[in-house]
Swiss-Prot record:
GO terms for molecular function: DNA binding. It is found in: Cytoplasm. One of its GO terms (cellular component) is cytosol. Gene3D superfamilies: 1.10.10.200, 3.30.70.980. This is Probable transcriptional regulatory protein Sde_1551. The keyword Membrane does not apply. The keyword Cell inner membrane does not apply. The lineage of its organism: Bacteria, Pseudomonadati, Pseudomonadota, Gammaproteobacteria, Cellvibrionales. Belongs to the TACO1 family. It comes from Saccharophagus degradans (strain 2-40 / ATCC 43961 / DSM 17024). It comes from the Bacteria. HAMAP family: Transcrip_reg_TACO1.
Amino acid sequence: MGRAFQNRKESMAKTSDQNAKVYSKYSREIYTCAKSGGVDPDGNLSLRSLLDRAKKDQVPSHVIQKAIDKAKGGGGEDFATARYEGFGPGNCMVIVDCLTDNPNRTYGDVRTCFNKAKAKIGSQGTVMHMFDHCAIFVFAGDDEEAILEALMMADVDVTDIECEDGKITVFTPHTEYGKAKTALAEVTNGAEFEVDEIQFVPQTQTAISGDDIEVFEKFLSMLDDLDDVQNVYHNAEY
């Protein structure tokens, strides 16, 4: 099927300023995840996945530990999730996920990014129906039948499974994340996941070209500069 999920390893920050932003975003997400689901990764699979991802993206251990210690202590900021949808340059579809302690500020900041790119921020549900909310796992392997059988035996609802270039990619509904990860860890003897995330995967792609490409890249850069923005999903193809 060749679903166009976003492997954020490819766009890992390169400069110190960009790294600082990445660390800040991870710190906020780890703190929020640990505070809501518990600080023990063995009992909080979402936290375990997040910590694995942070380590792969070379987030320093002291940044990770500080966020967990902060969650242990209670108190602190209360971050809420916020999600914004709309149409970006070239009429591509965009979803912006945020963690914020001030929703009014965050909405204003995100809307400004849309306006500067001559894009249109919409109401809830504007483009969401054109994305699948998926758990995605990518790991080394070539026996997709054995993987599929193990997932079915674990009563996991598999949306899709692909095998290409010595890697297997598994898609499940986001609600199946925990069961799927446990089953995959068992059948692969704890293989390392190249991708282990919950994402919004577009059902179709929108081709953009010409000036729209430059505007779109600036649009993504503006969103990435916002501390409250955690993830941006889109269906632009160029």
